[in-house]
């Protein structure tokens, strides 16, 4: 009698496992893996999924409601002088807490200016992983607003990208200064030729581009 009971229990367990396995097969994994394709990073305020991580002087970032390219506010970066005890440079990364599908875009664009003539580094893909890092060195800024375009190579691979925008800047002539960023967003420009090599020159682009392919 005990033998028959044991067999019956085992068969019941097998039946339950088979039933659960059948249910699992009905789940659409493509739906589960879908990430939002939001374009905005900062348009007067942080996008809904946006987080910030400071580098260098941790208090370098703020929101400015007086100096803007368009709208009601901009990002303000206070670059410290080299002797600042809280940090000798300013940097930070803006990232998505969940990840975004950027496959439909070919560039990150924004407007920028500085209180003095300077050169900074900007890019995308510098959070959690740098597999698809796009780094632009020597971006020239001055007191006038300029539109900056960061081309995105291989955007079809960016299905769950977290690193949306980063910046890095140091003092000029041992003095601190201010940088502003505004209207930071991803766009589909359709006019960019994405070379898959490093340190390339892009016509009309103010800087040296390093692409991770």
Language-model region placement:
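Beta-rich carbohydrate-recognition modules and glycan-binding surfaces
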Residues: 23-213
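Sec-dependent bacterial lipoprotein signal peptides
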Residues: 1-21
């Amino acid at each position: 009698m005990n033998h028959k009971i044991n067999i019956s229990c085992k068969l019941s367990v097998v039946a339950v496992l088979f039933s659960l396995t059948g249910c699992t097969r009905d789940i659409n994994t493509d739906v589960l893996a879908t990430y939002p394709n939001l374009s905005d990073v900062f348009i007067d305020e942080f996008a809904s999924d946006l987080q910030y991580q400071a580098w260098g002087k941790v208090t370098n970032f703020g929101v400015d409601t007086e100096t803007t390219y368009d709208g009601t506010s901009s990002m303000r970066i206070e670059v410290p002088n080299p002797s600042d005890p809280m940090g000798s440079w300013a940097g930070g990364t803006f990232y998505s807490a969940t990840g975004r599908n950027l496959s439909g875009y070919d560039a990150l664009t924004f407007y920028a200016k500085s209180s003095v003539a300077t050169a900074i580094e900007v890019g995308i893909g510098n959070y959690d992983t740098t597999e698809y890092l796009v780094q632009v060195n020597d971006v020239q800024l001055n007191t006038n607003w300029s539109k900056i375009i960061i081309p995105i190579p291989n955007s079809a691979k960016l299905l769950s990208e977290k690193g949306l925008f980063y910046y890095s800047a140091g003092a000029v002539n041992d003095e601190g200064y201010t940088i502003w960023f505004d209207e930071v967003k991803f766009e589909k420009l359709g006019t960019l030729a994405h070379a898959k090599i490093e340190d390339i020159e892009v016509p009309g682009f103010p800087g040296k581009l390093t692409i991770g392919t």
